[in-house]
Amino acid sequence: MKLWTRSGAFAAVEIVIAALIGAGLTVAQPAAQEKPLLAEQVFKNIRVLRGIPVDDFLQTMGIMAAALQFDCSDCHVAAGTANVDWAADTPRKVRARAMVNMVATINKANFGGRQMVTCWTCHRSRDKPLITPPLETVYGTPIIEPDDVVMQIPGLPSVDSILDKYIQASGGAQRLAGLTSYSATGTSVGFGGFGGGGAVEIAAKFPDKRATIILFSKEIGRGDEIRAYDGRSGWVRTPLNVLGEFQLTGSDLDGARVDAQLSFPGQIKQILTNIKAGPSTTITDLPAPASQSSLQGDVPLGQSHRVEVVQGNGPRGILVTLYFDRQTGLLLRELRYGNSPIGRTPTQIDFADYRDVNGIKLPFRITHAWLGGRDSIVLNEIKTNVPIDEAKFGKPAPLNTR
């Protein structure tokens, strides 16, 4: 029995993805988790994507699933059943290896190794790339998708003016300087195979500690979902994932640090380097699948916002783009890009429903989306400057399934 449908393909990537292109889980995990884990140390039959951290490997699976509109069962034998054989080679996995090598060769020969051609370049949610332009598309209204890298144009609002407006809108520099921690509670709804609601707790401690804990108390056999960063190390534990919990060492670690720092608006000017402002644009709320929208009927969807754009680099050069509401000055979206051998991997966090909490504006609605899933979080309470147990930011306790 499948744990997902094709409409939940991206969630399926995070649920069980044990492999590119062919993989089975090894048994010696716990001791190795204290060190950076490479894909070939954890999975079997890794022929192409060797030498990359496990978190970057999982993100690579997300790129493939997104580009071809696949789920795990399209490439892995009996995926979604008790009889799954991750290590078995299939024609599609063999073909995928060849395609990864082909893309690398194209980029090396034509673009100096820069990732100008990826799976998404040609496939665009199709198994086989479209080779003939449909006339409806040619003569219809073009869909202009923004580039990852923002172009700096003279005459735009300065970075300082945008960030100063955000600081003032969030409560002002003096009040923000007094924010040392906060704890929030509410509900979260997962995507696809992670559908269903859970209780959520978010804990943050200045300057760079953050944890999101989602408790699925009504789901028998499902463990808790945890994303934690303690200022140096990051951990993820996802229900139904073949890895249980694992330590972040690749791009997701850099992203976790940025997420934690952005929890405290007063330090916005210290988070990114090589920072620049791009042209203002319009963004629209991320679409919600039925598995989420049906359980959050009071959450408005499809709203558009005119925004100012700021982009810079986080730890180890990770590319981060921030979108600020032109009217209010508040942060509406964080879009960061991780690395993989076959292209950038986007993670998007949308912020909405800002409310005053002891003089500071904080978002009560958060949508966290990545290539492997989407969490829709609605908070009902935020408490500021409260004691927080440091253990919340560290390695998760052993998996507690029900």
Predicted features, each with a name:
Residues 51, 80-105, 131-145:
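Gly/Gly-Pro-rich "capping" loops immediately C-terminal to redox-active cysteine motifs
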Residues 235-266:
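Acidic/charged, solvent-exposed loop-and-adjacent secondary-structure segments enriched in E/D, K/R, S/T
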Residues 11-24:
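Bacterial N-terminal signal peptides
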Residues 50, 140-201, 398-402:
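N-terminal cleavable signal peptides for secretion/export
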Residues 219-220, 297, 301-400:
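Gly/Pro-enriched, hydrophobic low-complexity segments
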Residues 167-242, 274-292:
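N-terminal mature ectodomain segment of secretory-pathway/periplasmic proteins
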Residues 36-77, 159-186:
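Mature N-terminal segment immediately following signal peptide/propeptide cleavage
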Residues 69-79, 116-126:
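The canonical Cys-X-X-Cys-His
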